[in-house]
Amino acid sequence: MLLDTLLELAGGINNVTRILAPQGQVVLALKHPPLVPHLPDDVSLQSVLGEWQLSVQRTAEVSDQQLAAIGKAIAERQKLETLPYQTALDCPYRPLWHISPPQGLLNDPNGFIYHQGEYHLFYQWHPFACEHKDKYWVHLKSLDLVDWQWQSVALTPSDWFDSHGVFSGHAVSHQQDLWLFYTGNTRLGVDRQRQTMQCAARMNANGEFEKLGPVIRCLPEGVTEHIRDPKVIYTQGKWQMLLGAQTLAHQGRLAVYHSDDLLHWHFDKLYGDELGDYGYMWECPDWFELQGEAFFVFGPQGIASANPHHTIEHQNRIFRATQNAQGEIALLQGWPLDEGFDFYAPQTAQTADGRRVLCGWMGLPDETQHPSCDQGWIHQLTALRELEWREGRIYQHPLRELDTLQSEPHTLLLSDNVTELKTKSFALQVTLPWGCELRLMQNTQYRVTLTLDAENQLLRLDRSATQIRQGDTIRELKLDSPTVELRILADQSSLEIFINQGEHVMTSRIFTPRDASGISLHGASVDAKLYYMAPASAPFNLEVNVQP
């Protein structure tokens, strides 16, 4: 049967929500059941989990180009459907200089890269609700890594190979072209069988991204359908694709492919056996070099913490690694990148002057119940960080360009008298003795506390007295320094705490009312430097809609 005939039976392209292509079939998911009284014998109609699906066997008459044409038509409509959700709603929790979504749910940063004199950054977006469903990619650009401008909804879940989500991936700047690599996610049948493919897209002269379709269609041996988040690098005279993977034994591993042309990929092997049972899945791989050392970043899922306050299975890790002349990878020594509540799926980019800069998702996969959901949006990205390899460990520092948003420093005496900052967007530098407690974002009812437990040499971050609705409330970090040097970045509903010159970082969402802008220190009296933070340009397509 011709696709035109199937579309006519479906009631036209405007009645088609998805196109699927499972096992020699073509399936059109419909908004409404077709009005045709009798369907041909070779066409079936069924309701699958509340979605009407019209199916026919795929014949030689149906080409990939025809399927792509339907995908483009669906994408055009999907982009129009996001327009009402591109207006950012005013909210007391919305950051002034971090990237947040106008509405809906933001998660992983994607495609972070410097290309042709500009920085590009994408993020995962579900525009229509604060839930993880049918992911899109939003495209932002910047000249300075501080002010980001909305460009477009770059990719939508419109094609048979990504019908249930354009999952995470990275970008490649090759010659004059900007390529995107991502995981296409589809769900098939009443049991929602997952089908995973690695896909590519390329930016055209108009700044739009044209999908090239799947570049890896089949799973490597020994791996489940949980294989995703391609990172593509050029090394040893060839392209390599790194993928987070799950083995049939439900162990996380790194899958590696190679290619000569970015389009045809060949599987090499799985890496990571030296870590043993190190989580049931590895997500969001990144790979880079820093001061002559190679590093592998990933998100291992299913690692239990020895601390009873840490109950979240979604972890973050960076490992020092090596790759020999034959391309064999070994993972050596690893650490958490962030030890706060809300940090996942980081990506890095190299700046024009050679720095390695990181951006992460200030959220976690299971969190969908933040107070900002009452205003129709959830999650944000972290502040950008510069990475440094020094004295055998990774140090992280706030991006130096963020200094352009800072006011002149104000000396602030921290004591048990509450000082009203009258803002929740600031930077604070202070060195604290053991045995004291710093309270931030406080009023008479709410606060977040940083306790320096002298007896146990623990830095304890406690957000139990905030408006948090979901997630852990205490994080503890063992330190051995005689004092604790802090550099704190606050932005309305977030804290990023850089400890002892960036040796550790704790990133957290902190929800307190708009008037909770007090700060105090109990158990000591110390001078601090306070900087007020100015807003960055709003990373939205449409102006913020201020609610009365």
From Swiss-Prot:
Gene3D superfamilies reported for this sequence: Exo-inulinase, domain 1 (2.60.120.560), Glycosyl hydrolase domain, family 43 (2.115.10.20)
Location of this chain's protein in the cell: Cytoplasm
Pathway: Glycan biosynthesis; sucrose metabolism
Group of enzyme by EC: hydrolase
GO biological process, one term: sucrose metabolic process
Keyword annotations: Cytoplasm, Glycosidase, Hydrolase
Name by which UniProt lists this protein: Probable sucrose-6-phosphate hydrolase
Source organism of this protein record: Vibrio cholerae serotype O1 (strain ATCC 39315 / El Tor Inaba N16961)
Lineage: Bacteria, Pseudomonadati, Pseudomonadota, Gammaproteobacteria, Vibrionales
